[in-house]
Every structure is written in structure tokens, then in C-alpha cells.
């Protein structure tokens, strides 16, 4: 056998087979859920993974309002943001964010963003993530398949 004939397969944007998947986030720990979602967005579970190409799946998270934190993070963890004005540093705990509209989405999106590559590719991968607090989503036309996130490492 000629080992030089084996070429590494590199996927590009046109040949990447992107799928739509639905994940039920009920009673899932935020960090563990988001690390698996980040791998799905990146395409790490596919045999054709290419580091510099968007070859991951489009991920829809439903029941995001039912995610849980381990330990006392619900009350002790602090999210910091800055308004842009002097003295405009704001602090929120996950318990406070849950009360606000879109707060649970911000919690999950913040966690996934930290687990994706920093740079243009990571920012574009974040557009493939759709988060809904209830059971309904508006992507039925894409025929997403429901997966059990607990089967992934």
C-alpha cells in the first residue's frame, strides 16, 4: 500500500453537511449542557471536522428556562457587564437574570460563547445557536431531529 495516496479530507463551507438538531434543556446543568452544545456547533462530533471551517450543526435549545446550576451558583455567581458610561458597571446573578425577559437566553449564550474559539469563526458559529425558553420553536420547516444530549461526551 502506498501511504502517500491517503490524503487528509478537508471540508469547506459548500461540502459541510450541516444538520438541524433540537436539544431539550430540562433539568440539565448549564455548564455541561453548554460544553456539549459548543462541540455540536463546532462540528467536533463529526468525522469530517475541520478546525478552520464552520462544519457544525445548527442547534435549537428548547425548555431553556428549566436549566439548573450546580452548587450555589444560582445565587453566588455574578455576571458583569458595562453600559459604556462612567460608573456603568452592572452586576447580576443568575437568579436575577431569570426574572428578566431573555435572561435565561443570555445565561446560556454567555456560557456557549466562552467555550467557542475567539475570533471571526467563533462569532459566526454563535449565529447557529437558537434558544427558546418554552417548548415551541419556529424552525419546523428545517425538519430538525431531536437528540438526547446525555448520549454525548
Regions found by a protein language model. Give the residues of each.
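Ribosome large-subunit tunnel/peptidyl-transferase-proximal elements
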Residues: 1-110, 120, 143-153
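Short, highly charged C-terminal tails/helix-capping segments
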Residues: 131-140
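Hydrophobic, well-ordered secondary-structure segments
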Residues: 108-109, 113, 126
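C-terminal structural segments of small proteins and small subunits
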Residues: 122-132
Amino acid at each position: 500500500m502506498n501511504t502517500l495516496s491517503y490524503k487528509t479530507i478537508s471540508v469547506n463551507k459548500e461540502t459541510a453537511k450541516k444538520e438541524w438538531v433540537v436539544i431539550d434543556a430540562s433539568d440539565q446543568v448549564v455548564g455541561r449542557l453548554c460544553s456539549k452544545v459548543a462541540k455540536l456547533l463546532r462540528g467536533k462530533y463529526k468525522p469530517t471536522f475541520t478546525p478552520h471551517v464552520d462544519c457544525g450543526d445548527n442547534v435549537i435549545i428548547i425548555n431553556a428556562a428549566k436549566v439548573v446550576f450546580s452548587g450555589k451558583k444560582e445565587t453566588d455567581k455574578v455576571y458583569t457587564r458595562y453600559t459604556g458610561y462612567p460608573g456603568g458597571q452592572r452586576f447580576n446573578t443568575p437568579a436575577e437574570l431569570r426574572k428578566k425577559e431573555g435572561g435565561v437566553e443570555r445565561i446560556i449564550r454567555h456560557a456557549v460563547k466562552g467555550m467557542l474559539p475567539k475570533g471571526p469563526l467563533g462569532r459566526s458559529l454563535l449565529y447557529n445557536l437558537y434558544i427558546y425558553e418554552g417548548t415551541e420553536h419556529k424552525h419546523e420547516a428545517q425538519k430538525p431531529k431531536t437528540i438526547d444530549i446525555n448520549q454525548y461526551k
